[in-house]
Amino acid sequence: VVVVGYGTVKRRDLVGAVDQVDSKVFSERSNPSISRSLQGAIPNLNISMRDGKPSRAATINIRGTGSIGSGGGALVLIDGVEGDLETVNPQDIASVSVLKDASSAAIYGARGAFGVILVTTKSAEEGETKVTYNGSFSLHARTVKPQLVTDGYEWTTGYINAWNGYYNGQNPLPSYINNIAPYSDSWYKELARRSTDPSLERVRINDKNQYEYFANTDWMDAFYKDFNYSHEHNISVSGGNQNADYYVSGRFYDQDGIYRVGDERYKQYNVRAKGNIRIRPWLRLNNNMDFTVVDYHQPM
């Protein structure tokens, strides 16, 4: 069964460009949001992040950019109500359908001209009370780590060679490298001495009572970790009968930051409560409440 704009149909009876994934996509991936779990899961659903911050909202389009001006973002509906993918507990998802063709505009009008993403959350199942818990622990690593030149003598030698190669030795070296780092032949000689003899002091005070630093510091390694971790805990309770049913879930997600200095942490709390009560044979009362709190602290 596939969820479409006007209800549900069997996959064999489906007409139109619609793709759907079920809860397995989200149960196998530990991510702070649905959008990150959907990356690469549905054809022609393009999801990009400006950076790696866990709080960063995704840019979503279907089948490429649809508008030069507005960008052509897809309409996101969560249980029939327009919402934000970043605030939904991934473990609450029953299915996600993507409407890609013009039929979405016929149902939702101009707002659905660039496609529609239909998110259906889990509902209660009749029967005895069922309690479910799942948790995960994940390690995150950077895909690319820049290899920086940390040796001052090696860096300055490369700069001198590049300068002389460009000007063919016709122009003298500037007193400031890139208008930031001062240069002098005496400093260059001191860097050469410390490159060959690491036992020499890395910090000294000159005749003007100023500090001079000759340390070789890998600032990328000093500020950023090679790995950071996250852990997630989910619990849900559901049950009911033909007259009343309920589904209540809670989630705690905690991700450590990548900075070595400062207290960087991302925490997300989710609570969802769904219930149905049959008041009369012809009257049913439904409730669907979602509550999300995000606590994100970064040192800068």
Where are these regions (language model features)?
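Short, small/polar-rich motifs associated with maturation and membrane association
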Residues: V1-A273, I277-N286
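Cationic-aromatic interfacial patches
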Residues: M289
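Short edge-strand/loop segments of extracellular domains
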Residues: V294
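Outer-membrane beta-barrel translocator/channel fold
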Residues: H297-M300
